[in-house]
């Protein structure tokens, strides 16, 4: 198998994948997207003879455009541009989950500060204001008072970028001090962990403590449905425990897994399982084009 790996920086996640691919004897072409040019009618030569391309772009904007180019070129890419589009934007993500009947936090979107403040007041305090594009828990705000709401909305309105004029307001979910991250391939869980913190944000990137987690049948069902809702692929599905059930608050398309790999230890070889799936996907693509 000849794999192309899109990157702008090789992180530990990519090193784990590269090591597993090379240990199996696969050819890997690393493609630094900062150096490439993408013509609307002809693919760059670096994509010739690749069986599959793995998108590991750090920047969401690059990921969205490059996967769209690869789809147009007919080059198999993980994940597809359709999946990337649905996962990269929290509004589209929430709409996809809701349409698929996946329990997800109640969310309202507004486009002016006045309308956003009305929505916040309707939710009551606390509620959550999130950027529509972003990761690692950045620029997320738990709003506890009207004064805080007015200040944060003013700051967002002043930031300038059009994405900050889309106010994504969500109910605050009382979770048991943790959430759950599941790495899945086409809806099948590979490994899962909890991320715990005394802070309301439990992201591993913000220092949340991780521990292996065993999924029950209900969680597995929701992971499968959430994956299908965005088109499948190599995904990170985030859930919160709500009473005896779960709510899915996000599906991630360029998922990091180094913290998960550490959390599960010897019980699951995460890069091994990912490459197993990648091999099967490349073989299926070859059969289709044969």
Model-predicted regions and their roles:
Residues 252-267:
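Glycine-rich phosphate/pyrophosphate-binding beta-alpha loops
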Residues 201-246, 272-290:
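A long amphipathic alpha-helix within ATP-dependent nucleotide-binding catalytic cores
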């Amino acid at each position: 198998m000849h794999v192309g790996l899109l990157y702008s920086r090789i992180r530990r996640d990519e090193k784990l994948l590269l090591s597993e691919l090379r240990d199996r004897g696969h050819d890997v072409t690393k493609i630094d997207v900062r150096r490439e040019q993408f013509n609307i009618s002809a693919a760059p030569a670096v994509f010739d003879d690749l069986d599959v391309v793995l998108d590991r772009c750090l920047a969401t904007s690059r990921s969205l455009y490059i996967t769209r180019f690869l789809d147009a070129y007919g080059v198999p890419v993980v994940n597809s541009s359709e999946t990337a589009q649905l996962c990269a934007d929290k509004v589209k993500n929430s709409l996809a989950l809701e349409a698929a009947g996946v329990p997800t936090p109640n969310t309202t979107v507004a486009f002016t500060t006045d309308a956003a403040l009305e929505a916040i007041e309707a939710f009551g305090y606390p509620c959550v204001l999130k950027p529509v594009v972003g990761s690692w828990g950045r620029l997320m705000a738990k709003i506890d008072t009207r004064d805080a709401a007015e200040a944060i909305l003013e700051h967002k309105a002043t930031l300038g970028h059009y994405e900050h004029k889309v106010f994504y307001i969500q109910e605050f979910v009382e979770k048991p001090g943790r959430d759950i991250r599941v790495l899945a391939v086409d809806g099948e869980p590979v490994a899962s962990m909890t991320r715990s913190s005394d802070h309301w944000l439990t992201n591993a990137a913000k220092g949340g403590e991780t521990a292996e987690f065993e999924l029950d049948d209900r969680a597995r069902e929701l992971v499968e449905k959430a994956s299908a809702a965005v088109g499948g692929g190599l995904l990170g599905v985030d859930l919160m425990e709500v009473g005896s059930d779960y709510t899915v608050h996000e599906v991630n398309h360029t998922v990091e897994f180094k913290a998960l790999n550490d959390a599960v230890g010897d019980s699951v070889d995460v890069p091994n399982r990912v490459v197993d799936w990648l091999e099967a996907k490349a073989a299926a693509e070859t059969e289709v084009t044969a």
